[in-house]
Amino acid sequence: MPLSTSLLGKKNTYKDSYDATLLFKIPRINNRNVLGIDSNHLPFYGVDIWNTYEISCLNKNGKPLVGIGTFYIPADSENIVESKSFKLYLNSFNNFIIESIEELERIILQDLSNVTYAKVTGRIFPINTKIEFGIPSGKNIDNLDIVCNNYGPPDNSLIEYEDVLVEEEIYSNLFKSNCLVTGQPDWGTIVIKYKGKKLKYDSFLRYLISFRNFNEFAEQCAERIFIDIKNSINLDFLSIYIVYTRRGGIDICPYRSTDKSYTLPNDKRLIRQ
């Protein structure tokens, strides 16, 4: 279905009964074709991590159950899920009577797997679960004194490197893009790990800032950055992790890596989550 038929950016009525058909799928192939990515031979591995903070249903006695969900959608899934549709879908459980949170978890995982055409994993945690906060372990490049005048579209010519080999992690809290459909701001922290020729921090920060007024879905921004870096520098290893802040009770954190046996970033939340 075309994106224009989705519920994103439209006034919607919340349904009071569970409805899996609310989930709206978006084929990944469309944006990947634009980026020159062969969907049959992806240049990366990874996952989209969805953290959902507004999950509730009713138990057999009519008492509300609540939880926080984390779901992992493989980067090689055929489709992504449009976030507004996922929010409406989750809220359709609000008056749904169910045996337990575990049963709700099973239903959500199955529905997400059905719509993405991939095996989605994850779980729903109790609200009283202790969550640790932290900061990325790498070098923050935000304090560089740079002049910026390009806020979109992204300018990959700004990705420059020095003739020195490094293995490092850098990050920025200044990343921002906009929703492809509504234009609403998506704020995030981006973490880059790589091994190869050293990125020039000042020009690379300007590159990241050139996404500021650019309209693109979160997952697609991560893949664009991955491809732009990969095409600019011959690296032995590269991973991209964007931790977006929540909107509508959901935050989306795409992770892409050249390493097939990648290890997911630690589960510490950032302060803006």
UniProtKB/Swiss-Prot annotation:
Designated gene of the protein: queF
GO molecular-function terms, A-Z: preQ1 synthase activity
Entry keyword annotation includes NADP: yes
Family the UniProt entry places it in: Belongs to the GTP cyclohydrolase I family. QueF type 2 subfamily.
Predominant subcellular localization, coarse grouping: cytoplasm
Species, as recorded: Rickettsia prowazekii (strain Madrid E)
Name the record gives this protein: NADPH-dependent 7-cyano-7-deazaguanine reductase
Subcellular location: Cytoplasm
InterPro entries: GTP-CH-I_C/QueF, NADPH_dep_7-cyano-7-deazaG_red, QueF, QueF_N, QueF_type2
Cited function: Catalyzes the NADPH-dependent reduction of 7-cyano-7-deazaguanine (preQ0) to 7-aminomethyl-7-deazaguanine (preQ1).
